[in-house]
Amino acid sequence: PVQAFAEVFRHFGIEPTSQEVREPMGMLKIDHIRTMLRMPRISALWEEKYGRKPEEKDVKELFGLFEEKLMSILHLFAGPKPGVAETVKALREKGIAIGSTTGYTDKMMAIVAPEAAKRGYAPDVWFSPDSVNQKGRPYPYMIFRNMEALGLSDVRGVLKVGDTVSDIREGKNAGVTTFGVVIGSSEMGLSREEYESLSEEEQKQRCEQVAEKFLAAGADRTILNLEDLLKTV
């Protein structure tokens, strides 16, 4: 959805940077837009263009256009990242249940979930912000809904794995052990091809930068990729 966020802001005459678009990744999508409009540079550009600061009606207008754009392309981006299906299969063989939280709405997940399942990823349960009164990440409530559905009573038996700062905050707010996945993460913002085109030293530097962000947000540990999870669980 990165491109959809950028295109929506461009439609309103604001050119966001890649960092501004990616910083709120993982949040409920309308909260993502709300957060971007509060960013000092974007807010100042909006005021310069429209003669006033961004308002809630602007949030809703941007989100309406964003949702329209996203729904038309979402099926193209619903596949799991490399290694996810295999890792989930291995975890299930160890008797571990798989739950999921998302920044997508139920309407969006009606497209994403079936497409992801076709491509090998289907969690036992998933919950969107629609199921928790729009209190998505970094609120912990989607994790608690997963625990309820899976019959878990102790947060010490839960491991949250995510690739955005809001994922990390969600996990820590829920009181569960939380890992950040570095390579291929929204926080890194590189495609697999872009990452592999970097020199070994550049890859190391980018990984360290992302890991530091996750640890600063409270992550208990960082892992380079999801396959590394099997070494710790």
PLM region spans:
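N-terminal helical cap/lid subdomain that shapes the substrate entry/recognition surface
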Residues: 1-85, 89-94, 110
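Structural motif
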Residues: 24, 101-103
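Asp-based, Mg2+/Mn2+-dependent phosphohydrolase catalytic module
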Residues: 85, 89-90, 105-233
